[in-house]
A protein has these predicted regions:
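Membrane-penetrating hydrophobic segments
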Residues: 27-58
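Alpha-helical solenoid repeat scaffolds
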Residues: 3, 7-12, 27, 146, ...
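Membrane-engaging insertion elements
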Residues: 31, 62-127
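Membrane-inserting hydrophobic helices used for pore formation or membrane fusion
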Residues: 11-25, 85-89, 100, 184, ...
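Generic L/I/V-rich hydrophobic alpha-helical segments across diverse proteins
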Residues: 14, 21, 48, 59-66, ...
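Membrane-active amphipathic alpha-helices
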Residues: 1-36
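Charge-dense, extended regions
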Residues: 186-248
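Membrane-insertive, amphipathic helical modules of secreted toxins and fusogens
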Residues: 108, 119-197, 203
Length: 248
């Protein structure tokens, strides 16, 4: 059973960080208009990615990301012109877990596109583990099969980011991971209001996290989850899957 009790000081620091992030989101939501119509990017896959990273590490995030996209595309019976956006690696630090996430996700989908849907989880996990060896940014190159199965069976593309995050939090009793998931969810909700080319928002988020007095390990987990979530937002061509109605 996971235990990683947070100190009163760290709980307070996390509460303040969330409050600061909500304030930043509110400013972007206020300015997010095109004429009189509000627009939002559909970034639900980032929730699966963040959950994979926080609960299992970088290799699990890549596996979860690839499976969530593949399964959702099949369920909606939509053929996309491209699985990926043109900006999949734009404005991402080449040494970051986010960059590694996008580059490796694209490689796996392109090389195994025809077999991914029916591929056993063990086989995908082995592919990701082998390919991860080339990426120093992926510190945990092992794929926990049980965590991956939980994420994919729980992921709901028709639910909100927050609903998915709340469901993923049930996988762990570790408050550090639960808090990191909460913060990744807040950031994904904020990213809905900015364009793919916008780097100002994520820069603001990272400055707030860096300045926060939360503990080193918690901060590292949060920053990795944010990097993967931001990368996911730039990766999957999710607008082509929005043809079917989704829950608000």
């Amino acid at each position: 059973m996971e235990t990683n009790k947070l100190s009163t000081k760290e709980v307070q620091a996390l509460t303040e960080l969330k409050s600061d992030l909500y304030a930043v989101n509110a400013e972007y939501a206020k300015s997010n208009t095109r004429g009189l119509k509000k627009w939002l990017r559909w970034l639900i896959f980032g929730a699966a990615d963040a959950a994979g990273f926080v609960t299992g590490g970088g290799a699990v995030a890549i596996s979860a990301s690839t499976l969530a996209w593949t399964v959702t595309k099949a369920e909606r019976e939509i053929s996309t012109n491209s699985d990926f956006k043109d900006c999949a690696e734009v404005a991402l630090d080449k040494g970051s877990i986010g960059y590694a996430h996008n580059e490796l996700s694209q490689k796996i989908v392109r090389e195994h596109q025809d077999s991914l849907l029916g591929m056993p989880i063990d086989q995908l996990a082995e592919i990701v583990e082998e390919e991860s060896k080339a990426y120093p940014a992926i510190e945990n190159k092992s794929v926990d099969r049980e965590i991956l199965k939980q994420i994919i069976s729980t992921f709901n593309a028709d639910a909100s980011i927050q609903d998915n995050i709340n469901a993923f939090k049930q996988f762990t009793n570790d408050p550090q991971k639960q808090e990191a998931l909460d913060i990744c969810g807040i950031v994904l909700e904020g990213l809905q209001n900015v364009s793919d080319e916008n780097t100002t928002y994520i820069d603001q988020v990272n400055r707030l996290v860096d300045a926060s007095p939360v503990g080193f390990q918690t901060k590292k987990m949060i920053k990795g989850g944010i990097s993967v979530a931001d990368a996911s937002a730039k990766l999957w061509n999710s607008s082509e899957l929005e043809e079917l109605p989704k829950a608000k």
